[in-house]
């Protein structure tokens, strides 16, 4: 009995810790092994996770986005940290629009293409193409590299001004003007895109020809796996 009484304070403390720990460690509970939250690796990264809200080409929140956070494979996050460090030394910061994307979100895109157009959304994100043709044009796919966990959509910000660099088109503007090498943008806008591209390539990422914001780690750790866990905290 005396031993039990002595142990009670410790039992109470242990119980209290078990109650409080989920509040402090909930973030890690939702990330599978091999994945990390980008902000844990790159605290200076700005996040603007578009598919969590309605400011995207669907005009609504997308399935699987339960929090406005960014997740990547550990390898991709570390490589992106090198990108960020390099750019910060030049007065720039990275702003992330999307990173890991669950397969359920990709499926939601497919469902969306079968519905009616919203003229307001269409004019902002895909004015010169029908949504049913977005797959054929290479803007959407039934399997996305984002679901493998090593692809990121991002832009650059001027740290001093706190503004995005002018890239000639905005994120998710599904149009030829968003392609690398587009002749429809100015020399200054081309230089901004090239700064992002050369720095990303320097640290092991490859670009996607149709979208200036889209990069994938060349030596990605899960080249044949497509994940479906939610983007959550």
Report the location of each language-model feature.
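Bacterial N-terminal signal peptides
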Residues: 13-22
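Conserved metal-phosphate-binding beta-hairpin within the catalytic cores
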Residues: 215
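Intrinsically disordered, low-complexity segments enriched in polar/charged small residues
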Residues: 12-13, 219
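Short, low-complexity intrinsically disordered segments
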Residues: 6, 210-211
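Bacterial N-terminal signal peptides that target proteins for export
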Residues: 2-12
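Extracytoplasmic cell-surface/polysaccharide-interacting catalytic and binding patches
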Residues: 25-99, 104-107, 111-210, 219-233
């Amino acid at each position: 009995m005396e031993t039990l009484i002595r142990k009670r304070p410790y039992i109470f403390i242990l119980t209290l810790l078990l109650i409080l720990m989920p509040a402090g460690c909930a973030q890690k509970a939702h990330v599978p092994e091999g994945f990390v939250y980008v902000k844990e690796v790159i605290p200076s990264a700005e996040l603007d996770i578009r598919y969590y809200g309605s400011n995207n080409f669907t005009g609504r929140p997308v399935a699987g986005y339960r929090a406005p956070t960014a997740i990547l494979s550990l390898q991709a996050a570390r490589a992106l940290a090198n990108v960020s460090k390099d750019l910060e030394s030049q007065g720039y910061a990275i702003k992330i629009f999307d990173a890991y994307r669950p397969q359920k979100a990709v499926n939601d895109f497919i469902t969306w293409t079968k519905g009616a157009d919203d003229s307001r959304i269409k004019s902002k994100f895909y004015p010169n193409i029908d949504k049913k043709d977005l797959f054929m044009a290479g803007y959407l796919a039934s399997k996305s590299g984002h679901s493998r966990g090593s692809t990121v959509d991002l832009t650059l910000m001027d740290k001093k001004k706190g503004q995005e660099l002018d890239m000639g088109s905005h994120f998710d503007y599904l149009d030829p003007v968003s392609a690398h090498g587009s002749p429809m943008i100015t020399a200054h806008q081309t230089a901004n895109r090239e700064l992002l591209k050369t720095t990303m390539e320097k640290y092991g990422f490859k670009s996607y020809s149709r979208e200036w914001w889209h990069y994938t780690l060349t030596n990605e750790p899960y080249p044949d796996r497509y994940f479906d866990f939610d983007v959550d905290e």
